[in-house]
Amino acid sequence: MLPTRLLSFSGSRAISTSFCLRAHGSVVKSEDYALPSYVDRRDYPLPDVAHVKQLSAGQKALKEKEKAPWGSLTRDEKVELYRIQFNESFAEMNRGTNEWKTVVGTALFFIGFTALILIWEKHYVYGPIPHTFDKEWVAMQTKRMLDMKVSPIQGFSAKWDYNKNEWRK
């Protein structure tokens, strides 16, 4: 009885303490969704903020050089200024992806897997085809139905010519 009480007292306290320690393990940084954010979209070509928010010393010097006439900037500096403002160009945004290969491959995988399951079922689950599906059996059954004159007004036997022993045209 005493060990049970000690275990229950220390066990519940240890469990609750470990939960508290686990809960305070990391600090979650919350995003302020009221502030504008950067996004590359074709239908929204000029985002509210620049792509690079924290400029390095070289980028700050380049931004100062940007205030001068643009003819003095080299092509590489113009590209660097563009990359500070935007992550992708329109050509890069419009470039096709290879996602279709993944979709087609996944679809073909599942079609193949389904085919394997059907082949396995046909081989191991289903029995042999009943003898009533044989062409000879179907012919005998049709002859029997014609001999019995099944549905003679508008049905099966109405389409059979009993004098010529052939189907009516």
Curated annotation (Swiss-Prot):
Membrane-related topology note: Single-pass membrane protein
Pathway given in the UniProt record: Energy metabolism; oxidative phosphorylation
Pfam families, A to Z: COX4
Transmembrane regions listed in the UniProt entry: 99-124
Sequence positions bearing Phosphoserine: 56
Positions bearing N6-acetyllysine: 29, 53, 60, 67
Stored InterPro entries: Cyt_c_oxidase_su4, Cyt_c_oxidase_su4_fam, Cyt_c_oxidase_su4_sf
Keywords (A to Z) from UniProt: Acetylation, Membrane, Mitochondrion, Mitochondrion inner membrane, Phosphoprotein, Transit peptide, Transmembrane, Transmembrane helix
Annotated compartments: Mitochondrion inner membrane
Stated family: Belongs to the cytochrome c oxidase IV family.
UniProt subunit comment: Component of the cytochrome c oxidase (complex IV, CIV), a multisubunit enzyme composed of 14 subunits. The complex is composed of a catalytic core of 3 subunits MT-CO1, MT-CO2 and MT-CO3, encoded in the mitochondrial DNA, and 11 supernumerary subunits COX4I, COX5A, COX5B, COX6A, COX6B, COX6C, COX7A, COX7B, COX7C, COX8 and NDUFA4, which are encoded in the nuclear genome.
Biological role: Component of the cytochrome c oxidase, the last enzyme in the mitochondrial electron transport chain which drives oxidative phosphorylation. The respiratory chain contains 3 multisubunit complexes succinate dehydrogenase (complex II, CII), ubiquinol-cytochrome c oxidoreductase (cytochrome b-c1 complex, complex III, CIII) and cytochrome c oxidase (complex IV, CIV), that cooperate to transfer electrons derived from NADH and succinate to molecular oxygen, creating an electrochemical gradient over the inner membrane that drives transmembrane transport and the ATP synthase.
Name this protein carries in UniProt: Cytochrome c oxidase subunit 4 isoform 1, mitochondrial
Organism: Oryctolagus cuniculus (Rabbit)
Name of the gene: COX4I1
